[in-house]
Amino acid sequence: DADDEPGSAQERLAALLARPCFALPAFSDQGGPFAGTRGRFVDADGHDAIPWRRATLAALYCALMTDLMLDLIKARGAVLVEGPFAQNGIYIAALAALRPASPVLPSHETNGTSLGAAMLVDPDAPVEMPAAVPPPALDLAPYRARWRTLAA
């Protein structure tokens, strides 16, 4: 659990960046952009590594995969996050840092899917949007670039 690691989301991510470890895809055999590859943990040089700060690394991995998928579909604009990811401060901070031009909106609604379906019927229906999370003062671009290189 991410709560077992001390510090704020930004402090946890900064500690991981100071001693980088990468979770490389894929940890599921259900398809996706890395179908046929097996998940593993490596250091910055691509050598096998024992992951540390596992909860932080797992949340960062999920944010990197989300960022990649949004890039693949050429998504622009706000990113609305709901469900358990919306409650994960590390995931939200990492996604906001990875996509500083796109507001990241963590929803705390329990009926987001129903609201989305209703908006398809009535796009003008008033919906209260959650507040955007400001990107943390972390530069994840070099980490993302290295992760994508190692994952390719």
Question: Where does each model-flagged region fall?
Answer:
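Nucleotide/phosphate-binding catalytic cleft detector across ATP-hydrolyzing
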Residues: 152
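Active-site core segments that coordinate phosphate-bearing ligands/cofactors
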Residues: 1-82, 87-148
